[in-house]
Amino acid sequence: MRFYDTASAEVRDFVPLIPGKVSLYYCGATVQGLPHVGHIRSAIAFDQLTRWLEYRGFRVTVVRNVTDIDDKILAKSALSFEPDFEEGPDDVREEEWWALAYRYEQAFLKAYDTLGVSRPTYEPRATGHIPEMHALIQGLIDRGHAYPALDDSGDVYFDVRSWNRYGSLTRQKIDDMQGAPDADPRGKKDPRDFALWKGHKEGEPTTASWVSPWGTGRPGWHLECSAMVTKYLGTEFDIHGGGLDLRFPHHENEMAQSQAAGHAFANFWMHNGMVTYQGEKMSKSIGNTVSPAEMLELASPRVVRYYLGQAQYRSVLDYQPTSLQEAAAAVERIDGFIARAVRTLSGSVVSGAAELLFSSHGTVPDAFAAAMDDDLNVPQALAALHDTVRAGNTALTAGDNSAARTALHSVTDMLRVLGLNDVAAPARDEQADTALGVLVEAQLGARAQARATKDWAASDAIRDTLAAAGVVVEDGPDGASWSLKRG
């Protein structure tokens, strides 16, 4: 198994620190707005990684943080106390910063759940880990890598020139970097020094401040992740992930402050690529954005998940007007085979279907396994999936039920690894499934009789009635088969 490590800029063999166990941290959301496709693509990429590691037999501990205190959250909350230009005084939403953060956190969780992103082992909030952050800051001060601001602001800064490996993650020299944007330049030794602790400023809510040895204030963004990952995964762990846009300054600063504190920190750094809109960077200002919610208005959750997870995680994923249609067609081909195979192999619509669909058989094809072991090469893995679907359909047509069953087991296992087996699947009622099957089979029996007597009008009428109800009928050499139309 080999993954690309951003820090070494090469694909390396992955060997976990503890045999049989993997520790993974990936950056979650700063909950100051609704999720965008970049957030969701990143979550799906690391969900695929987790599922593959688990399939390979590893016990995976996953930590995904929630940044629930930040400059952007405070700014957004302050704006929410004033009416929008389209709203009247009665429509003003008075919302405290913590309430705003919680509301958007729930929106992220809903999006993750809808698109089949597994819940992490731990999902810590920054505001719940202030003591750990204080301890990390004090340790950096004691080691000579941090200092209280040279004015009365109450800030504490990381001294980038005290750490000779600063810039190594992104292969930059300090003198070529711009000044850190996350704090005012006053009180700094170097404009590139970044804030570990931000002193309380006039006009900020007192509820967004905590007492510290350096004055009342709140943590810096970069410090939050270092403190939380260390608490849950220790000072050395296997994989740190996130979007490519977080590589600098966020991950560069995380690595510097953690290693300067004496922590080995991450063994691998993995970054997923961005999502573009018809070849251009998405931007609200020019109106070329598409949100997960908008995608879900156009396609089912499984189709959206297929689209957002179909590219190799490090590559750019480009959104085109036809992207979801193409993903829907691919999902339809997969589901068509599954429906056909279940009907043939289970002996009825429901009986035996659960064993066929929901049991893990450990039978992914060698080509699929080789692709996933090769830095999560999902495009090649999907090619193996569709090859298996074609082989399964061929086996069904030939009446080779043994080969068809093997193909079905392989397909369901591959879908499970890719997170496509049960994305936002509605609860199934076995009695309802049985009743539906009996009714549809009765209609198909009547249609077969009509066709036998060449009553084509009656045959077409039955087919049209079933189609209107969402039942797709396909005629084959062994008679008619049916499946439910997918969203």
Swiss-Prot record:
Work out whether the entry's keyword set contains Zinc. Answer: yes
Family membership, please give it.
Belongs to the class-I aminoacyl-tRNA synthetase family.
- PANTHER family per record: CYSTEINE--TRNA LIGASE, CYSTEINYL-TRNA SYNTHETASE
Q: Which reactions is this enzyme annotated as catalysing?
A: tRNA(Cys) + L-cysteine + ATP = L-cysteinyl-tRNA(Cys) + AMP + diphosphate
Q: Where is this motif: 'KMSKS' region?
A: 281-285
Question: Under the cellular component aspect of Gene Ontology, which terms does the record hold?
Answer: cytosol
Region Disordered: list its residue ranges: 174-194
Give the co-factor note. Binds 1 zinc ion per subunit.
Query: What's the name of the protein?
Result: Cysteine--tRNA ligase
Keyword Nucleotide-binding applies? yes
Which keywords label this protein? Aminoacyl-tRNA synthetase, ATP-binding, Cytoplasm, Ligase, Metal-binding, Nucleotide-binding, Protein biosynthesis, Zinc
The primary location reported for this protein is: cytoplasm
Which molecular-function annotations from GO does this UniProt entry contain?
ATP binding; cysteine-tRNA ligase activity; zinc ion binding
Q: Where does ATP bind?
A: 284
What this protein needs as a cofactor is:
Zn(2+)
Q: Where is this motif: 'HIGH' region?
A: 29-39
| Xref: InterPro entries | Cys-tRNA-ligase, Cys-tRNA-synt_Ia_DALR, Cys-tRNA/MSH_ligase, CysS_C, Rossmann-like_a/b/a_fold, tRNA-synt_1_cat_dom, tRNAsynth_Ia_anticodon-bd
Biological process (GO), any one: cysteinyl-tRNA aminoacylation
Subcellular localization is given as: Cytoplasm
Q: What class of enzyme is it?
A: ligase
Q: Where is the composition biased (Basic and acidic residues)?
A: 183-194
On subunit structure and binding partners, the annotation says: Monomer.
SMART domains listed in its UniProt record: DALR_2
